[in-house]
């Protein structure tokens, strides 16, 4: 039988969620609800102001995601990044094309978390965050973008982001799970 029925509230716009945010996380097409929930929990615990999810990302309100998040999905502001065509239909190509531009227009430096040759280290990103405002490399508002399990971020996202950042690895390990890497990045950029 049914335990309860609930009405889902309408999601706010990206601009509303990011209005007073200084640090946001973006989940690009993360489909494993365990990872969605873990990222939400880490974001809440490590002072991320908001979480944005792309249209193909798993639902943070899905039962497994909500359980893994330990309920923090109901505490941290979040919304889906969506855009609409002139006729009112959803624009399936809004992310990453106009979506990244929207974040930039809101004053965010967009950071693709990816293992690329041109990536800077997480330590360098942290230095830029804490640099004096007059330093030309200073970052004021930060949008950390995390990619799906296996494939990572799309090449379109990496190409459009302001910076690409990697977490240095040891012992021949090539990468971390998205939930682990997000926690490391959230902690380092506090």
Predicted segments, located by residue:
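Structured adenosyl-cofactor binding patch, chiefly the S-adenosyl-L-methionine
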Residues: 2-4, 42-46, 57-74, 155-190
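Generic low-complexity, intrinsically disordered sequence content enriched
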Residues: 101, 107, 126-129, 133, ...
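Secondary-structure junction/capping motif
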Residues: 12-13, 121-123, 177
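Active-site/ligand-binding-proximal alpha/beta "capping" segment
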Residues: 111-173
